[in-house]
Amino acid sequence: MNENHYLLLTPGPLTTTKSVKEVMLYDWCTWDVEYNTMVQEVRAKLVSLATKEEEKYTTVLMQGSGTFSVEAVIGSVIPANGKLLVCTNGAYGKRIVQMAEMLQIDVVVSQTEEWEPTNIVEVEKLLQEDKEITHIAVVHCETTTGIINPIVDVCKLGKQYGKVTIVDAMSSFGGIEIDIADLQIDFLISSANKCIQGVPGFGFVIAKRDELLKCKGKGRSLSLDLYDQWETMEKQNGKWRFTSPTHVVHAFYQALLELEKEGGVRARYNRYYNNQKLLVNRMGEIGFKPLVDEKYQSPIITSFIYPKEGFEFQQLYNELKRYGFVIYPGKISKVDTFRIGNIGDVHEEDINRLVDSIAKGAVIG
């Protein structure tokens, strides 16, 4: 239980702790040595969360939403003569395709249904057939549905065929254990307001140093030039090129400390996993079925199929908001769904309160 006006059962922005909010009550200077030292600590902590082989990787922080960081990677990493293979089964994979097209990058798509994971057989077929592909991108947890994609297999194939690997781990990093060195990920992207439980305002890229160094001069945007942003942070002890979200950075630093206190990524995963299992079991008791097969379901967010013809999501949303909960509408076109997030400062008692509210007639009645 927390002191928020509403409990956000969403995939980010999400419900944060009181202590994360409190550090934003103060003002900070972007040129201050103490602040820039904190930025460097944040960068180092992110690398240590991502891999045991810390010397091979570095972190770049980028102002804006997570999408800004994804576009920074797509626009800075792929050369003019490069070609990108995007594995997509939801809105965020499609967004990467849209970015590539807007940036006039050659792109090929491996498309699967939104409730099915990336098809590894098709990915390999495309890699075999198209020798011009230089980079491969995949979304780890596609929050359109809550499905988990097989990034281990995708990245293994990418390296087998000599490609640079890009993983959008926006909604999974910090909540699902991975080692980017073991998985051979060259660029991993996430955001402050997801599983680490900070607030919106910046994203980050954890990059293999060798690959990042190849990006010098390739940026297609001034403000989203990944290499230039990294070089400034490296040479000027945590300085951002342009005004940084100081309050958000302090909140994120506090959130990192709280992740460590909770027991790290494994402990947080266990909490999210237990939240999700409890949610599905209890929702099942009152007639709601999840969209995604259990073996592909993430612990991050769950899509539920409308229980009957004539079901009104807006009624559900409005009534649950009266009970103190905020949830998400569906985001797929072929099946009517709504979504409930399991992440943030959310615990089993919160899930029970939510389902109790629904069972009392907050939705159907």
Swiss-Prot record:
Keywords for the protein's UniProt record, in alphabetical order: Aminotransferase, Pyridoxal phosphate, Pyruvate, Transferase
Lineage top rank: taxon: Bacteria
InterPro entries per the UniProt record, alphabetical: Aminotrans_V_dom (IPR000192), NH2EtPonate_pyrv_transaminase (IPR012703), PyrdxlP-dep_Trfase (IPR015424), PyrdxlP-dep_Trfase_major (IPR015421), PyrdxlP-dep_Trfase_small (IPR015422), SP_NH2Trfase/AEP_transaminase (IPR024169)
Catalytic activity: (2-aminoethyl)phosphonate + pyruvate = phosphonoacetaldehyde + L-alanine
Modified residues (N6-(pyridoxal phosphate)lysine): K194
GO biological-process terms attached to the record: organic phosphonate catabolic process
Keyword Iron-sulfur: no
Keyword Cell inner membrane: no
Cofactors named for this entry: pyridoxal 5'-phosphate
EC number: 2.6.1.37
Positions of disulphide bridges: none
GO MF annotations in UniProt: 2-aminoethylphosphonate-pyruvate transaminase activity
Gene3D superfamilies noted in UniProt: Aspartate Aminotransferase, domain 1, Type I PLP-dependent aspartate aminotransferase-like (Major domain)
Family: Belongs to the class-V pyridoxal-phosphate-dependent aminotransferase family. PhnW subfamily.
Subunit structure: Homodimer.
Role played: Involved in phosphonate degradation.
PANTHER family: 2-AMINOETHYLPHOSPHONATE--PYRUVATE TRANSAMINASE
Protein name in UniProt: 2-aminoethylphosphonate--pyruvate transaminase
Protein species of origin: Bacillus cereus (strain G9842)
Gene that this polypeptide is encoded by: phnW
